[in-house]
Every structure is written in structure tokens, then in C-alpha cells.
Amino acid sequence: MHKLIIHGGKPLKGSINISGAKNAVLPIMAASILTDKLHITNVPKLTDVGTMKDLLRSHGADIEIIEHQDEFELIINTENINNFTADYEIVRKMRASIWVLGPLLTKYGKAKVSLPGGCAIGARQVDLHIAVLKAMGATIEIEDGYINASSKGRLKGTHFVFDKVSVGATINAILAAVLTEGETVLFNCGREPEIVDLCNCLITMGADIAGIGTSEITIKGKDSLNKASYKVLSDRIEAGTYMFAAAITKGDVKICGIDYHIVENIALKLIETGIKVVPINNGVQVTYEGKLNSVDLETNPYPGFATDLQAQFMSLMTLSSGVSMITENIFENRFMHVPELCRMGADIVVRGNKAVVRGVEMLKGAEVMASDLRASVSLILAGLSTNSKTVLHRIYHLDRGFQDLEKKLSNCGADIKRV
């Protein structure tokens, strides 16, 4: 099994190009079921993308892959969908597999999807996915670990209020609603840029969607959608991760290929800590200027601070001058990186969904183990900050969400290699 060897203590200097957004490309790939052909560009080279390709192929899709140096192009032909079951062996690898449920059900009137897997960071139940599809007229039962869904005729437009903001359920609802009979109005929706990107792709395919980027989305169902081409937006979570990497190594890095407005909340939080962050053409520049203040943080649905960046921010706060309180409001059990950071000398105490982080002068290298995707990269940031050697085990999590991570960091001066 591979591991990463990190010799820290080197300030990152240079530029990093941001890849396509994992959390946008996966639902867009699922949306290909709604039409006959979808051409997607700026696709990141990630194992989760490979898992979604395998899933779509299992349903009968034909996928042409055009490989470029920094991205894939995918041409997905879904004219011959002939299997409506998403098997456990594929779905267990990735929670995003549940996003084929809405498209299969709304287009073909039936779907059988295994209850999903993915990162071990809490229950993340599918209740809201099921509730909104039932509101559209679907019959759904959970049997033997599978969601069995069917409808008599087309799904019907509905008004539905999500009990809590759910990115995943918002996506499945939108994917189903675009082919319903009538109008659907969704309240308390997720507002994430990746949801906006999915909606923009669906509009390119001929969908009628209003209220994009707000908590109230109105969708007028169509009889069918068109073939289309679409470029996926850049990954704000990857961008934020490298912004924190520049800060924790006392570096100076240009993050390129990202719109500033979708990372502005990250930039503002960094500025609070004393890090210099300025917009540049097609990106943002992050510069350490000699101080790192303790700052409290709460994760919240967008435009709040992303839960997917909480672990990385915590790594930064372990070296701050003071005490910070980090509150995780999205997922339970998302502090699994804390014991590993403490092995490196961090002073962190967890109380429920809150972590009290007391800054220390320096972390020390250690052998550590990744528990999930975002936790693994937080340990890399911690390792980069030390003046010693860190060995990170179970790095397969990284390849689910970060393209060419070692290469991008090495090009900015990091001493990091996979063995």
C-alpha cells in the first residue's frame, strides 16, 4: 500500500493550477442519463470520476475518454441505458452514486440503488432524497440494503421544503424535477457553486430552472433534454486547500484558474488570521506576512464555511498564536483527524461538535494515518509545516479528491513523494 513521505520546513512559492471540481462533475455525469449524449470538459483525473464512469457503464452508457495533460474530456452516450440497478459493489465506493437515482427514476420510471458508501464521516442519511422523490409521486421502499423506486407514468411537479439544507438531496431533486410533468418548487435548497454549475449544465441541455444560487429553486419539467457540451467549474475545495498550504508553510503562492468570488469566504477567513490574500487575474495570491492569529470557525452550508475545508483550517490553527474554537455543524464524527494531529504535537480537545485548538510553536513529524479524504490532506499540510519527516499512510483517500497533489506541491518547493 502506498504512503507519502514529507520532509517539511520549506515555504511554498510559485503557482498552482486548480483542476475541475469533483463535487460538480459527479452530478453532471449523472445528469447524462437525462439526455442521449453529454460532452464534459475540465474533468479532473480522480478515482471518484472513475467510479462514476464504471457506474454509468454498468447502466449501459458508452463513454469515450479523451485524455489531456491536466484533464479529461468525457463524451457520454446514454442512448442505450438498459440496466436500472446500481449495484452495491460500485455504490459502496462512493456516496455520490446515489445521484443516479433521480435521473433513472424520472426518465425510465424505475431505479434500484444500493444504499451508499464513501468516506466514513457520519451517517449522512438518504431520508431527504427519498422524501422529495415521494413528493413527486414515486413509490419507494428500502429492501435488503437497496432503495427500490418506481413511478406509474411520469413524476409530477411538487412543492417541497427540505427539513434541513442538504446538498445531496437538492441535487437529486433537481435531477428528477427537470423531466417531471408540471412545475416543481424546492425550498431550503443548497446554494453551493457546484449546485449552480449542475443547473447551468442542465439549462445548456434545455432544462427550465429559475432561482439558481438561491434557497428557492423553481423547475418547469420538460418532455426531454438535448445533447450538450459543458465545461465543469474549478474546484473551490482544492483551491482552499492550497491557500491554507501557502499559509501554513509561510509561503507565497498564486492559486490560478479559479474565480475569486467562489473562494472569497475562504479568503476572508484567512485574512482574519493575518494572512495576506489578494485577487489576481483568474485567481488569488496568498502570502504569509509574519503572523498567524487564532480565529474561531463554524462550518455551515454555502455561503458559510465549507465542512470540506474544516480539517485543513484546523491544521493551520494548530500553529496560531492563541486559542481557536472550531464548530462542525454539517457532519457528525468529522474530527477523526484530531488524534493524528495530536500525534504531531497539536493541542486539541474535542467536546461534541466543537474542537478547542491551542496554538503551539511548532508541530513535529510523525507516522500518521488518514481516515478520510479531507482529513488526509490536513495531515499533509501539518507535515509540510514541520522541520522533520512525516509519513502518511492510507493515502488512497487522496486520489478520490485531489489530482496531482504531490506534483502541484513539489512544483512549489515541497519535498513530498509517494512510495
From Swiss-Prot:
Pathway: Cell wall biogenesis; peptidoglycan biosynthesis. It comes from the Bacteria. GO terms for biological process: cell division; cell wall organization; peptidoglycan biosynthetic process; regulation of cell shape; UDP-N-acetylgalactosamine biosynthetic process. Phosphoenolpyruvate binds at residues 22-23. InterPro entries: Enolpyruvate_Tfrase_dom (IPR001986), Enolpyruvate_Tfrase_sf (IPR036968), MurA_subfamily (IPR050068), RNA3'P_cycl/enolpyr_Trfase_a/b (IPR013792), UDP_GlcNAc_COvinyl_MurA (IPR005750). Keywords: Cell cycle, Cell division, Cell shape, Cell wall biogenesis/degradation, Cytoplasm, Peptidoglycan synthesis, Pyruvate, Transferase. UDP-N-acetyl-alpha-D-glucosamine binds at residues 95, 164-167, 308, 330. It is found in: Cytoplasm. The active site is at residue 119. Belongs to the EPSP synthase family. MurA subfamily. This is UDP-N-acetylglucosamine 1-carboxyvinyltransferase. It comes from Rickettsia massiliae (strain Mtu5).
